A protein has these predicted regions:
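Short glycine- and acidic-rich boundary segments immediately preceding or forming the N-terminal edge
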Residues: 1-27
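Metal-dependent phosphoesterase core characteristic of DEDDh/y 3'-5' exonuclease domains
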Residues: 2, 9, 31-32, 45-54, ...
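Short, flexible, glycine/charge-rich loop motifs used to bind or transfer phosphoryl groups or to couple energy/partner
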Residues: 22-25, 102-104, 130-132
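Residue-level marker for buried hydrophobic side chains located in beta-strands
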Residues: 34-36
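Short acidic, Gly/Ser-rich segments with clustered Asp/Glu that frequently serve as metal-coordination loops
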Residues: 38-46
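Metal-dependent phosphoesterase signature
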Residues: 82-103
Length: 209
C-alpha cells in the first residue's frame, strides 16, 4: 500500500512532541481556556436528530463552570444509554437545549474551548445552536486528541497520520460522564507538560458519544 506521506524521523517526532507539549502548556496558562465535554443521544453523521443529554465545562483550575443533564426531548436510544448511563428517567423535567444552549453560548463567548475529539463536540454544539436559533458566539477551539496523539508519536503508515489515542481515564468517576471526561482531559494536558504522572485509575475512554 502506498504511503500517504513520509514516515516521520525520530527527530521529527521529538520536535512534534515538543510542539504538542508547548500547546498544552499554553492552554493551561491561558485563563480563557475551557475544557468541554458533551454526552448525546447519538452521532450527527448517523442521526441528524442527535441531542445533548449532558454538558460540562471546566476551567484550567479544575473548577466546573457548568455541569448538568439536559432533556433531549426524545427517547435516549439504548445504545447511547449503555455508553454514558443516562436514561430517560434521569432527564424528566429537566431543561432542554433551547434553554441550556444560550447559557453555554454565553459561557464560551471569547473563550478558547478545548475538547477531546473536538470535531464531535464542537460540531454537535454548533449544529444545535443553529437548530434552536441560538446565535453562535465567537470562540476558538482546539482538539486535545489531535495534540495528544501527536505527543504519543504512534505513526500509522496506512493512514499517513498519527494513531488516534483514546482519552486516558485520569479522573475518578464513571467513564462517559461529561464532568469526569473534562477532568480527565485537563489532567491529560498536565501530564503532557509533566505536571501529572499518576497512572489512570481504570481503562481508557472511547469517546464515541
Amino acid at each position: 500500500m502506498k504511503l500517504k506521506s513520509t514516515i516521520p524521523s525520530e527527530d521529527q517526532k521529538a520536535k512534534i512532541k515538543e510542539e504538542a507539549t508547548a500547546w498544552a502548556k499554553e492552554r493551561l496558562l491561558d485563563h480563557n481556556t475551557l475544557i468541554l465535554d458533551i454526552e448525546t443521544t447519538g452521532i450527527l453523521a448517523q442521526d441528524p436528530e442527535t441531542e445533548v443529554v449532558q454538558v460540562s465545562l471546566v476551567n484550567t483550575s479544575g473548577r466546573p463552570v457548568i455541569s448538568m443533564l439536559v432533556n433531549p426531548g426524545r427517547p435516549i436510544p439504548l445504545v447511547a444509554q449503555q455508553i454514558h448511563g443516562i436514561d430517560d428517567r434521569m432527564v424528566i423535567g429537566l431543561p432542554n437545549f433551547r434553554v441550556v444552549g444560550p447559557m453555554i453560548a454565553a459561557l464560551i463567548k471569547n473563550k478558547h474551548v478545548v475538547a477531546y475529539n473536538a470535531s464531535f463536540d464542537i460540531h454537535t454544539l454548533v449544529h444545535l445552536f443553529g437548530k434552536y436559533d441560538i446565535p453562535v458566539p465567537d470562540f476558538e477551539t482546539s482538539c486535545a486528541m489531535e495534540a495528544y496523539s501527536a505527543w504519543c508519536g504512534e505513526w500509522m503508515s496506512h493512514k499517513g497520520d498519527w494513531k488516534w489515542q483514546k482519552l486516558p481515564k485520569l479522573a475518578f468517576g464513571n467513564s462517559h460522564d461529561s464532568l469526569v471526561d473534562c477532568m480527565s482531559t485537563l489532567l491529560l494536558l498536565k501530564k503532557m507538560v509533566g505536571d501529572f504522572s499518576d497512572e489512570p485509575p481504570t481503562e481508557d475512554i472511547d469517546l464515541d458519544f
